[in-house]
Swiss-Prot record:
Keywords, alphabetical: Ribonucleoprotein, Ribosomal protein, RNA-binding, rRNA-binding
Any GO BP annotation: translation
Cellular component terms (Gene Ontology): cytosolic large ribosomal subunit
Protein name (record): Large ribosomal subunit protein uL18
Function: This is one of the proteins that bind and probably mediate the attachment of the 5S RNA into the large ribosomal subunit, where it forms part of the central protuberance.
Species annotation: Synechococcus elongatus (strain ATCC 33912 / PCC 7942 / FACHB-805)
Quaternary structure and partners: Part of the 50S ribosomal subunit; part of the 5S rRNA/L5/L18/L25 subcomplex. Contacts the 5S and 23S rRNAs.
NCBIfam families reported in the protein's UniProt record: L18_bact (TIGR00060)
Gene coding for it: rplR
GO terms, molecular function: 5S rRNA binding; structural constituent of ribosome
InterPro entries with a match to the protein in the record: Ribosomal_uL18_bac-type, Ribosomal_uL18_bac/euk
Length: 120
């Protein structure tokens, strides 16, 4: 039986998460991509705490976005998550693409976060 795209994403995510762990010094920038929106969190896996979060559903972005599921929305979320992480004192992170390919919306979020000052 053919493996679905969603199952391929889940397998990649499990494989990636075996090696990527967020520490207090270098937390994990986790990305979740749905059809209509994109979500990002900065997570300290050692403590099990989310340090910062942003999404295309965020009230700060919702009014200015025409759609939550395009590259412009992803770039806006990347910039917002970088600002919120830096406000908490986080400058370097480990990027967790969530099993998604580094292309399109995931790439737009990552590049916007880098431009806004996060290092990874």
């Amino acid at each position: 039986m053919k493996v679905s795209r969603r199952e391929s994403t889940r397998r990649r995510h499990r494989r990636v998460r075996r090696t990527i762990v967020g520490t207090p010094a270098r937390p994990r920038l986790s990305v979740f991509r749905s059809n209509n929106h994109i979500y990002a969190q900065v997570i300290d896996d050692a403590a099990g705490h989310t340090l910062a979060a942003a999404s295309s559903l965020d009230p700060d972005l919702r009014q200015s976005l025409t759609s939550g599921g395009n590259q412009q929305a992803s770039a806006a979320v990347g910039k917002l998550i970088a600002e919120r992480a830096q406000a908490k004192g986080v400058t370097t992170v480990v990027f967790d693409r969530g099993g998604n390919l580094y292309h399109g919306r995931v790439k737009a979020l990552a590049e916007a976060a880098r431009e806004a000052g996060l290092e990874f």
